[in-house]
């Protein structure tokens, strides 16, 4: 047996012995009557205590004579004869307990407290005071075991063994990793901030179907499921777009939805098959209005959630305080591939030659617009570090966007990039029912030619457009990628509580 395998075997034995001892303690608790009591109530969390009392001097705390009740997980314990110090962790952080034998009911200290284990969940009551080192603490007069932990804390056995364990057992990651807890607290604040921002601007939050007969609103491969009662194959939605625009037809002029989308595609540091999007639609507006809204949203969130418009990310600092850069797709290609002749981007053969010269395999079904978009993706996208809007997307890759009035080969569309990745996509909506029907037919032909991500023909949506969609602009923002930026996270798995994982065999 190798040294590594021997060490692993020893750890398994240690863990089994530890769990055996803990189960024996639980059995003793069961014999006493109520092993998992639910009658303890706390009146403060640790962060509330620190916010209110950290600044007070020891003498002032003593004079105030404040009694508090707290509850949480025992993370550390230092037993020093007749007294001990405990670190208790709750949702707000950590607070220190001072536990003295003579201040508790008879027998609690030696017969109960000393037999409890790290990871157990406790309830404590006592007076606030400060130690000689100035640490806010609770001098306990009551201490109760609320939940017996049968497994030890991860750091007792060298922490979580690998990165994947953090995702598979997120509960352990949250117990032991302050950074992870803060990431998901920030995510919650971002979502609350988005809702506040949208409602303040007259938008109504709505919910649209997660299972759809026709998957639409994006170019992606869907998940397929079966509805037994209807005996009908259905699709998990890839986007809510077409349903939201039906609502605008119906008279709800400003709507938004924050919810899950599902795309049966690859998993990477930027992609999870199940992800969260915010989509909004705004009648009597165009894509330029949404550029302004997007810039304001990100600037507001940075200031409100992080307290600054200078957001660090790896070696970069994203500046949400200054005006965001705006480039057309052709301008971006020229900027990051200076030798490009702009005229070549308007000619199929010339653009194809450029694409092939930089290693892009051009499919037979691609038109000029798709080729130029692929060139942009290859030469420019990774360089768009600071907040940047890219405009004038080809109509070929924008089947739901309104054509530009001056040049019908492009659309009134933008994508929003930060850190070299797309964060948002918005455009003036196509509200010409006949044009939309033709573009759906083009997508059907592309699917027949082998494009799995091409859209289906949605006859009911065309019918809705025939009733009249007001001039409208729509925007989609990837919430997970937004959270990555605001929390300095470099993989999408770090900002999704339970990311998609292959089952452990």
From Swiss-Prot:
Its cofactor is Mg(2+). It is an enzyme of class 6 (ligase). GO terms for cellular component: cytosol. Its main location: cytoplasm. GO terms for biological process: lysyl-tRNA aminoacylation. Coiled coil: none annotated. It catalyses: tRNA(Lys) + L-lysine + ATP = L-lysyl-tRNA(Lys) + AMP + diphosphate. Mg(2+) 1 binds at residues 415, 422. Keywords: Aminoacyl-tRNA synthetase, ATP-binding, Cytoplasm, Ligase, Magnesium, Metal-binding, Nucleotide-binding, Protein biosynthesis. It is found in: Cytoplasm. Mg(2+) 2 binds at residue 422. GO terms for molecular function: ATP binding; lysine-tRNA ligase activity; magnesium ion binding; tRNA binding. Its EC number is 6.1.1.6. Pfam families: tRNA-synt_2 (PF00152), tRNA_anti-codon (PF01336). CDD domains: LysRS_core, LysRS_N. Belongs to the class-II aminoacyl-tRNA synthetase family. Homodimer. This is Lysine--tRNA ligase. It comes from Salmonella typhi.
């Amino acid at each position: 047996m190798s040294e590594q395998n021997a060490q692993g075997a020893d750890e398994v034995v240690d863990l089994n012995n530890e769990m055996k001892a803990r189960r024996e303690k639980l059995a003793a608790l069961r014999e006493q009557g109520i092993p998992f009591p639910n009658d303890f109530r706390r009146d403060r969390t640790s962060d509330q205590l620190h916010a209110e009392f950290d600044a007070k001097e020891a003498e002032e705390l003593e004079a105030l004579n404040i009694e508090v009740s707290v509850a949480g997980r025992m993370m550390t314990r230092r037993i020093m004869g007749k007294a001990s110090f405990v670190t208790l962790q709750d949702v707000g952080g950590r607070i220190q307990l001072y536990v003295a034998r003579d201040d508790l009911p008879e027998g609690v200290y030696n017969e109960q407290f000393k037999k409890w284990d790290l990871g157990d969940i406790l309830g404590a009551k006592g007076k606030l005071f400060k130690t000689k080192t100035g640490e806010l603490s609770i001098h306990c007069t009551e201490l109760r075991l609320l939940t017996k932990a049968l497994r030890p804390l991860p750091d007792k056995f060298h922490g979580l063994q690998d990165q994947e364990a953090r995702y598979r057992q997120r509960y352990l990651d949250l117990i032991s990793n302050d950074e992870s807890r803060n990431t998901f607290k920030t995510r919650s604040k971002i979502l609350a901030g988005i809702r506040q921002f949208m409602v303040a601007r007259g938008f109504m939050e709505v919910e649209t179907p997660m299972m759809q007969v026709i998957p639409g609103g994006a170019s992606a491969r869907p998940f397929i499921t079966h509805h037994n009662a209807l005996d009908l194959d259905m699709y998990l939605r890839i986007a809510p777009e077409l349903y939201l625009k039906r609502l605008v037809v119906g008279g709800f002029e400003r709507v938004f939805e924050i919810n899950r989308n599902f795309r049966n595609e690859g998993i990477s540091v930027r992609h999870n098959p199940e992800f969260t999007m915010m989509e909004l639609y705004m009648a009597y507006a165009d894509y330029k209005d949404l550029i302004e809204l997007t810039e304001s949203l990100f600037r507001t969130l940075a200031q409100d959630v992080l307290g600054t418009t200078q957001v660090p990310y790896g070696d970069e600092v994203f500046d949400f305080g200054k005006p965001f850069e705006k480039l057309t797709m052709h301008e971006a290609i020229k900027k990051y591939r200076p030798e490009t002749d702009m005229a070549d981007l308007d000619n199929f053969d010339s653009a194809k030659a450029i694409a092939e010269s930089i290693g892009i395999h051009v499919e037979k079904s691609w038109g000029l617009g798709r080729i130029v978009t692929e060139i942009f993706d290859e030469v420019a996208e990774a360089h768009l570090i600071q907040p940047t809007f890219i405009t004038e997307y080809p109509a070929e890759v924008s089947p739901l966007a309104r054509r530009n009035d001056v040049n019908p080969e492009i659309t009134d569309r933008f994508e929003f990039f930060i850190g070299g990745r797309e964060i948002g996509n918005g455009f003036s909506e196509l509200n010409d029912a006949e044009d939309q029907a033709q573009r759906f037919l083009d997508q059907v032909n592309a699917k027949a030619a082998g494009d799995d991500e091409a859209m289906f023909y949605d006859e009911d949506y065309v019918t809705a457009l025939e009733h009249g969609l007001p001039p409208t602009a729509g925007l989609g923002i990837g919430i997970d990628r937004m959270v990555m930026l605001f929390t300095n996270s470099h993989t999408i798995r770090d900002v999704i509580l339970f990311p998609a994982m292959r089952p452990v065999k």
